[in-house]
Amino acid sequence: MISASGCCFLALDTGRIMLQQRSKTSSHPLTWSFWGGKSEKKERPIETLLRECNEEMGILPDIEKVYPLHTFLSDDKKFTYNTFCITVFEEFIPVCNSESSGYAWVGIHAWPKPLHRGARAVLEQPDMVEKIITIYNRQKDKLDLPNWLDSF
């Protein structure tokens, strides 16, 4: 089975999410997607996620918490994709490698276009968006931060 992991970053200071724009030479070129990639042998999903993010953006920011968000299993059961939401205290600027053409911090429901089909399948599901909002609200309450989502 082929396995992969990816994530969006959720900034607790703004309530915005960071997505990656895939490079012109990648599969699904110039679509907006999650950071991540394929697992190496015997790698757990979280290990894949952290390795891939480190490769794609040079250095990881201080991570507040990692939340499982969604798991996709193909109909033929030969491919699985684990999506996570990583909370960070504040927005940061990634140092993108050649797999990315750029990045964007965006508000909930203000997704850039075109979305990669996998990202679209997660971000356009109301229950997944609600889960992201719940993650944000729980974390910002713990840290006594203002609720930026009220402005979206």
Model-assigned labels for residue ranges:
Residues 22:
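Short loop/turn segments immediately following the C-termini of beta-strands
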Residues 15, 31, 79-81:
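Conserved catalytic motifs of the protein kinase core domain
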Residues 37-125, 150-151:
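Unchanged
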Residues 26-30:
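A conserved beta-turn-beta hairpin within the catalytic core of GNAT-like acetyltransferases
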Residues 120-152:
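Charged phosphate-binding loop/patch that engages nucleotide di/tri-phosphates or the phosphate backbone
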Residues 31-37:
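Conserved acetyl-CoA binding element of GNAT-fold acetyltransferases
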